[in-house]
Curated annotation (Swiss-Prot):
Pathway: Metabolic intermediate biosynthesis; 2-deoxystreptamine biosynthesis; 2-deoxystreptamine from D-glucose 6-phosphate: step 3/4; Antibiotic biosynthesis; ribostamycin biosynthesis. It comes from Streptomyces ribosidificus. Keywords: Metal-binding, NAD, NADP, Oxidoreductase, Zinc. Zn(2+) 1 binds at residues 37, 59, 144. Gene3D superfamilies: Medium-chain alcohol dehydrogenases, catalytic domain, NAD(P)-binding Rossmann-like Domain. It is an enzyme of class 1 (oxidoreductase). The gene is rbmC. Zn(2+) 2 binds at residues 89, 92, 95, 103. This is 2-deoxy-scyllo-inosamine dehydrogenase. The keyword Zinc applies. Its cofactor is Zn(2+). It catalyses: 2-deoxy-scyllo-inosamine + NADP(+) = 3-amino-2,3-dideoxy-scyllo-inosose + NADPH + H(+); 2-deoxy-scyllo-inosamine + NAD(+) = 3-amino-2,3-dideoxy-scyllo-inosose + NADH + H(+). Binds 2 Zn(2+) ions per subunit.
Amino acid sequence: MKALVFEAPERALLTHRDIPDPAPGEALVRIAYNSVCGSDLSFYKGVWHGSTYPVVPGHEWSGTVVDVNGPLGAELIGTNVVGDLTVSCGTCAHCTARTPTLCEDLGELGFTRDGACAEYMTIPVGNLRRLPDTLPLRAACQVEPLAVALNAVDRLGVTAGEKVAVMGAGGIGLLLAQAVRLRGGSVTAVAEPVPERRAAALALGVPAAVSGEPGALVELTRTHPDAVPDVVLEASGYPTAVQESLEAVRPGGRVGLVGYRIGETAVMAPHHIVLKVLTIRASMGPGTRFEEAIEVLASGAVTVDALLSHEFALDDYAKALDVALRRADSNTRSYFNLQA
């Protein structure tokens, strides 16, 4: 089978290897689609946490179960699925508290063990989620990032009638905007430096999309008081965006940290936090939102066409990574079609 391997920082190679055998309790999945997200790009550049080289990247995927090792999950053979990247021990204090992303022995598909940038992948059966026939496999590769967005919105407690601003209109940012609406909130503005991504946000009905330059969102809230958000969801990971979020949110408001960049330090003015009595909360991973993400994608309540901007065959991995890294050609998200 073909498999893309990150051998070392900034060194990727397309390899040919045997189809892997699933271990007991695991399934073998034929991958259909896999999208490239910001964490994959950071991993490629060598600035990511808890990752191991060499490894096959990829954790935003969809595919079909072709084999299962053991009785558990045998009914899934021949069905279309997606899956959680988190491979936790299940026994530590964090796992028993149902916070597996904090597992003391955390493994992650596409980072510490081979992921979905390959024609086949093995995965624990318990990580799989079955897809309805009404959800195309192309759209389904966005179930995982949509679950991340839903989890973040819920961790911040966004409720009906609240105003929300989103920092960053990449894949996660555009999904956050739609997740806010599912909870009855309204997105007053998106801040994003890439013009095509701002256009994508506007096409989703966001009323204002500012440049993403430092101070742009704050200036909007000064000139348009109705745009002052109750909640700011920071999805870009850029250090300056954290300070901007603190300044833009209303007194008594909430700031959610969703995006992050390893090795970069945000310089903040703590008086904004204290004087405005702000709540800052982080969110990581899909939590328990996979099933809902599948449901709303299948129903059409969330659209991902604007996210999946550039399709590539796995053979064209170098161009896929280059376009994504440079945000070239109006790129929002590169993805691999492994059925091609």
